[in-house]
Amino acid sequence: MRVIFAGTPAVAVPTLAAVAASRHDLVAVLTRPDAPAGRGRGLSRSPVGAWADEHGIEVLTPARPREPEFLDRLRALAPDCVPVVAYGALVPPAALEIPRHGWVNLHFSLLPAWRGAAPVQHALLHGDELTGASVFQLEEGLDTGPVYGTVTDEVRPADTSGDLLERLAHSGAELLIAVLDAIEEGSARAEPQPNDGVSLAPKLTVADARVRWGDPAFAVDRRVRACSPAPGPWTTFRDERVKLGPVTLVAGGPELRPGELLVEKSRVLAGTASTPVQLGEIRAAGKKAMPASDWARGVRVTAGEVLA
């Protein structure tokens, strides 16, 4: 089939590479426009756009996919199908109807669970033990289309959202290629999503990434892992923001108030609503990440001081 790949962030690149290596004819890539990045805020190509440039593939970057010029180019390219991974913009009906097999989206959850922009983060934040990826027919609703297939993945105790997303990016790419092959062969079957089990996964904000020391230890651990690497878990110490690395659940341990710090010889503990957690790395503003014990010695944590 003639296909145009739609995607933007780095997590979409494994699927783009798989599509390019498949039996299908990749005629163009659709991605979000170049955006300011880095300290200089210069315009930067999306990871998907950069990959396509390196491989000599046409890149389409409409500000809005309803623009007449884009729709005209889409018709001229005449794709049979448009596979999508995290494109980042709503696709209007006028664009959805151009490919004869429509737009087929890879989403990183077991739909109808966690519809929205941050499915992996919400799976970790809510303590899911099993998650996965789904390939479904894109339609106007938010991740509501019929599902062609799924792949599952067990959540590991130390998984961050980055870890889990990396695994799903590769297993999901294999799933999407299998669905494209089945569509071409006429054997693909999409099943409507059930009405039960629907949950939403809006993008996590910087405010969401602030650690709540008044939560139980398991919830603190989930939030830290869900927000790693982005938007990045953080807290405050002496009214200054610091970023946190992984934390470790501690069996038993001393009784500490929520956020209260205890510096021991080889570890730093922080209190929660239940048992303490052991802090891993800490990065103060303008500094490199360092082991929590080194940070505590450097700032000279005193008895009773707290993270907030």
From Swiss-Prot:
Keyword Protein biosynthesis appears in the UniProt entry: yes
EC code(s) of this entry: 2.1.2.9
InterPro entries xrefs: Fmt, Formyl_trans_C, Formyl_transf_N, Formyl_transf_N_sf, Formyl_transferase-like_C_sf, Met-tRNA-FMT_C, Met-tRNA-FMT_N
Organism listed in the record: Salinispora tropica (strain ATCC BAA-916 / DSM 44818 / JCM 13857 / NBRC 105044 / CNB-440)
Positions annotated to bind (6S)-5,6,7,8-tetrahydrofolate: 109-112
A GO molecular-function descriptor: methionyl-tRNA formyltransferase activity
First-tier enzyme category under EC: transferase
PANTHER family reported in the protein's UniProt record: METHIONYL-TRNA FORMYLTRANSFERASE, METHIONYL-TRNA FORMYLTRANSFERASE, MITOCHONDRIAL
Reactions it catalyzes: L-methionyl-tRNA(fMet) + (6R)-10-formyltetrahydrofolate = N-formyl-L-methionyl-tRNA(fMet) + (6S)-5,6,7,8-tetrahydrofolate + H(+)
UniProt-recorded name of the protein: Methionyl-tRNA formyltransferase
Role played: Attaches a formyl group to the free amino group of methionyl-tRNA(fMet). The formyl group appears to play a dual role in the initiator identity of N-formylmethionyl-tRNA by promoting its recognition by IF2 and preventing the misappropriation of this tRNA by the elongation apparatus.
Similarity comment: Belongs to the Fmt family.
Record keywords, A-Z: Protein biosynthesis, Transferase
Entry GO CC: cytosol
